[in-house]
């Protein structure tokens, strides 16, 4: 009799994806973040579901319903902070996951990479809309500022913004639709993640050396299941330390003040994981130019497979490209810091220089490093 996991139509899919999947024997801990993202997504869907049971998407009661969750619902405070800090953990894992793809040349799997970028956009949209829901000061003004950016689109901009708002300002209609989208998008993300995996399993995983590993594969279970469980335990440990000891460290104090359209907070800024893009947006004095730079700062990832000039796939044996990669990481950290600072000297010029460096590195310096390394190989 054949094994049920190899014969049953449904179990067979799981078997080929997580049990008997041939996996390169040398993939490092940087390959753990895909499974960690899956865990983050499940955690966010579950905590979000329980929060939605008590939340009311109405401008008059949204803020107090969140307070009610924290004060009156059993373990409501924990569910709320798991959800808020879970989003931060999600983005930390995401940035590392994308960085790993950049470093080891995983972007040469075109379909997997492109779906990953669509996932990134969907995730950013979901997180932004979730930030609006507690209806604090930063929720309201963040929603106003970010949606207003679309008014920079020529001819249709103003109409588009009013259409998204459902009126002439961010109000009840906006909050209701943001809640509806925030609820449905994680399930779309789940479907996209499955597609992402489907395309990945067509080619098999990349590995740190960047060379084909068909002659040296091992089954996913038990080797990588146990490795993923260790990663998951560490993720949960860090998340619980955040939730139980420093629940508000990544949030904004302004969001504990109910939304007031009549008073603007001194510094309007998004959550920390959007600050790098916000800094790029602010570094350009022109509104349309800023919006284009903001969009391109993420869309530029689509160009990366076409900007690969090196004869080697991975950066493992390319010291010059490694320098460029870590310079890019340092630049993104600088942009994140600048995004949280007020618009004044010297932060303006630092932000502008960091933005120029960001685009220069990806479009010019990294491809150039690849060409130089190719020539060095001929010596």
UniProtKB/Swiss-Prot annotation:
Description of how the protein assembles with itself and partners = The cytochrome bc1 complex contains 11 subunits: 3 respiratory subunits (MT-CYB, CYC1 and UQCRFS1), 2 core proteins (UQCRC1 and UQCRC2) and 6 low-molecular weight proteins (UQCRH/QCR6, UQCRB/QCR7, UQCRQ/QCR8, UQCR10/QCR9, UQCR11/QCR10 and a cleavage product of UQCRFS1). This cytochrome bc1 complex then forms a dimer.
Known function: Component of the ubiquinol-cytochrome c reductase complex (complex III or cytochrome b-c1 complex) that is part of the mitochondrial respiratory chain. The b-c1 complex mediates electron transfer from ubiquinol to cytochrome c. Contributes to the generation of a proton gradient across the mitochondrial membrane that is then used for ATP synthesis.
Q: Which coarse location class applies to the principal site listed for this UniProt protein? A: mitochondrion
Q: Give the GO molecular function terms.
A: metal ion binding; ubiquinol-cytochrome-c reductase activity
Extra facts? Heme 1 (or BL or b562) is low-potential and absorbs at about 562 nm, and heme 2 (or BH or b566) is high-potential and absorbs at about 566 nm.
- Cofactor(s) demanded: heme b
For this UniProt record, give its keywords in alphabetical order, as a comma-separated list: Electron transport, Heme, Iron, Membrane, Metal-binding, Mitochondrion, Mitochondrion inner membrane, Respiratory chain, Transmembrane, Transmembrane helix, Transport, Ubiquinone
From the Swiss-Prot or TrEMBL record, give the protein name: Cytochrome b
Q: Where in the cell is it found?
A: Mitochondrion inner membrane
Q: Which residues bind a ubiquinone?
A: 201
Question: PROSITE patterns from the entry?
Answer: CYTB_CTER (PS51003), CYTB_NTER (PS51002)
Any single Pfam family the record assigns to this protein: Cytochrome_B
The gene it comes from is MT-CYB
Database matches in SUPFAM superfamilies? a domain/subunit of cytochrome bc1 complex (Ubiquinol-cytochrome c reductase), Transmembrane di-heme cytochromes
Bilayer-crossing residues are 33-53, 77-98, 113-133, 178-198, 226-246, 288-308, 320-340, 347-367
